[in-house]
A protein has these predicted regions:
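C-terminal/peripheral segments of proteins
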Residues: 2-515, 520-523, 532-710
Length: 710
């Protein structure tokens, strides 16, 4: 263990220059808990838990509600929230060790805290800063009350920490982190970066014209890991200042990233346009800190930053790493040369403010005004409102590039001609607003097929230098097929489409399975039987499907290697391996998918339908375990269906994979798992009367118990 940690540190050092190395023991000191309690007294929020433990937070001010939201989330998942804060500071390796060191380095490389220190009070409005302060105060109050659970350096939290977290995460949605990690490892440049399963999501809106009952329907369905820093948390917020949203957020967010209110709602999937450029710099052979630009030698901005890494117990090592910046942006030096990165969202603090405005929006115009700030660098939004208006907005801060250059390749960094400085205005991004087709979708796919023709944007109307993606995910293919075939969608239809567990005939999975099924396995009894199963497979993953285990496990193993940029394993060898395992564990090659696909949480162990990139999106651990089963670890992280009826009534139904709490002792640790496994939704209580009828807990954080309403 000790040797492994030391070797890992040595490997990290090899990624860049080292100027200082010191081992030390960290003395764990506590923050001023009394000051945190005193600061918390300035806020007044009421947190009511419904029968599933979902927190409904109310308060007079938005800042009060943010305070209560932070406190409630800390009650449910304090360890993850603390790690989010440490990640934002570039201090996570001080707790989690070498595996977090590269992430810490990226915080410094991107210059996040330099920008915050310079412009926090300038770029962010007073209401936004007040909201951030309230959220930080909620986390600090919980930490003060649970000092024994506080990680080193995790408290006190400041509003600036939350801004740093947004600045770090937003560009990662379109793949900046993959590009940076690739360059740090000395790998090849991929523009745009490869899509990853962690970035999947789904959103669909149905207009009254396509609904059987004249209702407007919105599905928001973030898809990602079920636990950890990118897991989704469900809540409801109402304030006396007009904040009224139910939806989801990820740890460290004081705002809903996807949600719905009485007037409007929105969801998104991660889009992957070309929003970053890599420049090859011409270094000075006589001075490693100079590079050529427009005929002159310019000095790189050079900083040294500390990276504290926990080895074991209280023993830490602090390294000092070189951080370089050019006119283009952050610079990485590796064995292949000197590379600069320029990316959408660079040095922009206002992402959190844009989401704040979205949370407060009550019309399409106010919602798009928030996007028009240009502070959210990507994300493909779906919008719906109570008036029946729906829209798809392929949002992005698209660089205005000189079309004479090939922006799909690394660029010469020695001339100003390749240095873009402006973005296309929001008016120029692809949009579909109130289409005659009556529906829009977003499923990590091209915006040129987000509805039925002729209502789609035309690809030729957008410059190729915008780098807009043109491919379709399986979820997009299936959603288009199902919805285009139904002119009168009922509530039951819409739910069934969300939980559709099949693959399109032209999906990557179907193409791979067809190839394997059509091969000649004569003379190999095991593969002959496997091929027979694949030929009969209907491309679906319902629980009783007997073709799914062999087909899906094989396809997942092969296609995930493609997705992650690893060498592709030989498909027939993979098929043989899983055929052998199915025979070993189940006595047959075709057990039901329910026997193999499992949702596990504590003592809960339930069968699941679905698979990767299905509308019923489920991600699994690689391969199978020693019982022949595979455990779901990601996919449909939050499912919310918001409906505005013809007469203006608002309804929200939802489900998460496990429950609202990460504590094994909580009754809400896995109480939603049976619903999730069965593809069912719970109804969220939206009126005060409905909420109080099923309230399981009511509190006012930081206030005496006798002040809590009964």
């Amino acid at each position: 263990m000790i040797l492994r940690s030391i070797l890992a540190v040595v490997a990290f050092l090899a990624l860049g220059s080292l100027s200082f190395f010191a081992a030390h023991q960290t003395r764990l000191t506590w923050f001023d808990a009394g000051a945190a309690i005193e600061a918390g007294a300035k806020y007044d929020a009421t947190v009511v838990r419904d029968r599933y433990g979902v927190p409904h937070i109310s308060g007079r001010r938005d800042a009060d509600v943010a305070f209560g939201l932070a406190y409630a989330h800390a009650q449910d998942d304090f360890p993850t929230l603390q790690r989010a804060v440490l990640a934002a500071r570039g201090r996570l390796a001080n707790v989690d060790g070498i595996q977090a060191a590269q992430s810490d380095y990226l915080v410094h490389l991107l210059g996040i805290w330099n920008a915050i220190d310079e412009r926090y009070d300038i770029d962010l409005s007073e209401p936004t800063r007040a909201l951030l302060d309230g959220y930080a105060a909620g986390l600090n109050l919980y930490a003060a009350q649970h000092k024994g659970d506080v990680l080193p350096e995790a408290a006190p939290v400041k509003g600036q920490d939350i801004v740093a977290l947004f600045m770090l995460r937003l560009p990662f949605f379109y793949g900046l982190d993959e590009q940076l990690r690739g360059l740090l490892a000395g790998g090849e440049v991929e523009i745009p970066p490869r899509k990853t399963a962690a970035a999947r999501a789904l959103a669909i809106a149905i207009a009254p014209s396509r609904s059987a009952d004249g209702a407007t329907r919105l599905l928001l369905n973030p898809q990602g890991p079920f636990t950890g820093p990118l897991s989704w948390y469900e809540a409801r917020a109402t304030s006396g200042e007009g904040w009224n949203v139910a939806g989801g957020l990820i740890p460290g967010s004081p705002l809903f990233l996807a949600g719905a209110g009485p007037d409007i709602g929105w969801g998104f999937s991660a889009n992957h346009p070309d929003l970053l450029d890599v420049y090859t710099l011409e270094g000075n052979p006589n001075d490693r800190f100079f590079y050529r630009f427009d005929g002159d030698w310019r000095r790189l901005t050079v900083r040294e930053v500390p990276i504290a890494i926990r080895l074991f117990g209280p023993l830490r090592v602090t390294l000092r790493r070189e951080v370089l910046t050019s006119l283009q942006g952050p610079v990485i030096r590796n064995e292949r040369g000197l590379f600069a990165i320029r990316y959408a969202g660079q040095d922009d603090l206002k992402g959190v403010e844009a989401f704040y405005r979205m949370n407060k929006a009550r019309t399409y115009e106010s919602f798009t005004d928030a996007l028009a700030m240009g502070a959210i660098p990507s994300l493909d939004f779906v919008y719906a409102d109570k008036t029946g208006r729906i829209a798809n907005i392929y949002n992005g801060t698209f660089p205005q590039r000189d079309p004479s250059h090939d922006w799909t390749q690394p660029l010469a960094g020695n001339v100003s001609a390749t240095l873009w400085k402006t973005y296309f205005p929001f008016a120029d991004v692809p949009k579909v607003v109130a289409p005659g087709s009556g529906f829009v979708i977003s499923a990590n796919a091209t915006p040129f097929q987000s509805t039925s023709d002729p209502f789609n944007p035309k690809e030729e109307a957008f410059p190729s230098s915008m780098g807009i993606e043109t491919g379709l995910s399986n979820r997009a293919r299936r959603a288009l097929s199902l919805i285009e075939g139904d002119r009168s969608i009922t509530a039951a239809d819409f739910k069934s489409y969300k939980f559709d567990a099949c693959y399109a005939p032209d999906s990557d999975l179907a193409v791979l399975i067809k190839d394997l099924a059509e091969r000649n396995y004569a003379g190999d009894a095991l593969l002959e039987e496997a091929g027979h199963i694949l030929r009969r497979y209907d491309l679906c993953t319902e629980k009783e499907n007997r073709g799914a285990p062999l087909a899906l496990l094989t396809a997942i193993t092969v296609l995930q290697a493609d997705e992650q940029g690893r060498p592709r394993p030989e498909p027939v060898a993979v098929l043989r391996g899983f055929a052998t395992r199915m025979l070993e564990y189940f006595g047959r090659l075709d057990p039901t998918w329910a026997e193999v696909s499992r949702l596990r949480r504590g003592t809960v162990d339930l069968p699941l339908s679905g698979g990767p990139d299905a509308l019923r999106d489920i991600e699994f651990e690689p391969g199978v375990d020693d019982t022949g089963t595979t455990r779901a670890v990601g996919g449909d992280a939050l499912t919310v269906l918001s409906t505005w009826s013809r007469d203006g009534q608002w309804q929200v139904e939802s489900v998460v994979p496990y429950g609202s709490s990460s504590s094994e002792s909580s009754p809400h640790y896995a109480d939603q798992a049976p619903l999730f496994a069965d593809g069912r939704l719970k109804e969220l209580p939206l009126t005060e009367g409905a909420l109080m009828e099923q309230a399981t807990d009511i509190e006012r954080p930081g206030k005496p118990d006798d002040t809590v309403p009964q």
